[in-house]
Amino acid sequence: MFLKKHKSKLLLVPRDEEQEDAGIVAVLTDRIPSVLLVRWFDLFCFGFAMCSYALDFFSDIGIAIFHFWAGRYLSGSLVLAFALLPSVIINIISMVWMLDDEMHWKRRAHPRRTGTFELNQKRFIPLSKMIVLCICQMGPLFWYYKALYYGWMFRKSSNENTDGEKRKCFSKMVEAERDATLLRFFEAFLESAPQLIIQGSIAASYFQNYYQTGTYPYWLYFQAASLLLSIISISWSVVVQNRSLRMIRDDKVNIWPHEAVLQFCWRFLTILARIITLVALVLIFGINVVPLISVHLLVTLVHVIFLQAIHIDACTHIEKLLLLINTFIHIFIPFNMVEGNTRWRYLTAYSVEFIEMMLVCWLLPLSLNTFPYIEKVQVGVPISFIAGIAIMMMYYQFFHPNRRQLIVTQSQEDLSLNVQKSVETLTPKLESSLEISGEQNTSQDLVSELLLDVEHEN
């Protein structure tokens, strides 16, 4: 268990060029489930992700403008910097992916993603519009919109199109969602999570200053709404990342809506407690919080190496990079980046968070004894954390998708036994019929056709 290397489930790295996702070939045969299903909940996830991304970004820009308008240039600069710099990085990556799709489209080759062309080989949208989207920092919305479009086309034409066309629509949808969720996941921890610490510290300081007057400036309400949107954005990005990975793998059971809601509640409550803890650390120690975060990173790096070591064939540098990314993510939330049992990983990571949270709650009265509602904060933060952990335990005990996988596996085994018995019964009859009729078809061909009929009937 300890120091054992596991396969990464955050990033699928091909061993060679032939293993790259081709959209038309590889994804259709290896990466998507045998039973294709697009629910209304899946389309809702795409739409909700688009709305939350846009609201989160523009709310941060609006808060920065409020600070500049009031003459708080340092606060405005910090908010704007942590909003724009990560967004520029994410949109550059998105633009590179779009250009990659455009290059493959022009060569009429199989692209690594089924990117900018529809089923009739036309562009999904013109390249000029893609560039405008990225300049406006809305590049990730392109991938969500494409996933939403092909998901809608799949549902709309389920009874009309052939199986091949439906599989193409499904593969385009899941590939677009894969790119979108990966971009959104990194955006959450490059922009939203650090932004929470910056804006939370600013809002807490001004809230304390204005508390005595009994009146609060209007921008403080907008900042509170922006903080709430950022927490929702981070929580949802983790949920949809997990859902997306399960959706495209035949060896995994997809997440049902109520399971996604439980995951969201678990993440939201634990992230809320964690962000308040980090903001309190900033208020108590100021710039001296950097060494404390460094100690946390060191502790996290140790248990991540022991419990979540990553193995990627012939990609040692990517292994190290993902290890560092996972360590950074653990500043804000525990995250399971590799295959395998999560029990010890979450137990260790959440234990570290709980110890840090209780130490901060114990230190709060000494340094922030004049902070409004300090007693309620001391009680509310642990309650939020414990409630989130309780939902997590309930999710893993009663609602985890793997509990349904056992039922699916058993039904598949029963189906295989029925098919095998049918073949054993029908083969002698087929052979005798072929001898009498003298037809050219072999018994193996007829058995194959009958197998499909038996599977369909079952």
Swiss-Prot record:
Q: What is this protein called?
A: Cell death abnormality protein 8
A GO molecular function term, named singly, is: phospholipid scramblase activity
Topology of the protein relative to the lipid bilayer: Multi-pass membrane protein
Q: What Gene Ontology biological process does one annotation of this record name?
A: embryo development ending in birth or egg hatching
Site label Cleavage, positions: D21, A22
Q: Does the keyword Transmembrane apply?
A: yes
Instruction: Give the similarity note.
Output: Belongs to the XK family.
- Highest classification ranks of the organism: Eukaryota, Metazoa, Ecdysozoa, Nematoda, Chromadorea
Instruction: Kindly give the InterPro entries that the UniProt entry links to this protein.
Output: XK-rel (IPR018629), XK-related_scramblase (IPR050895)
Q: Which residues lie on this side of the membrane: Extracellular?
A: 67-77, 145-219, 317, 375-378
Main localization, broad class: membrane
Q: Which GO terms describe its cellular component?
A: plasma membrane
Q: Where in the cell is it found?
A: Cell membrane
Record-annotated membrane-spanning stretches = 46-66, 78-98, 124-144, 220-240, 275-295, 296-316, 318-338, 354-374, 379-399
Question: What's this protein's function?
Answer: Phospholipid scramblase that acts downstream of ced-9 and caspase ced-3 to promote phosphatidylserine exposure on apoptotic cell surface. Phosphatidylserine is a specific marker only present at the surface of apoptotic cells and acts as a specific signal for engulfment. Regulates apoptosis kinetics during embryonic development. Not required for engulfment of germ cell corpses.
List the keywords (alphabetical). Answer: Apoptosis, Cell membrane, Membrane, Transmembrane, Transmembrane helix
Which regions of this chain are Cytoplasmic-facing, per the record's topological domains?
A: 1-45, 99-123, 241-274, 339-353, 400-458
Q: What happens when the gene is disrupted?
A: Delayed cell death process.
Specify the species: Caenorhabditis elegans
Changing D21E has the effect of: Loss of ced-3-mediated cleavage. Reduced phosphatidylserine cell surface exposure in apoptotic cells. Reduced number of cell corpses at the comma stage followed by an increase at the 4-fold stage
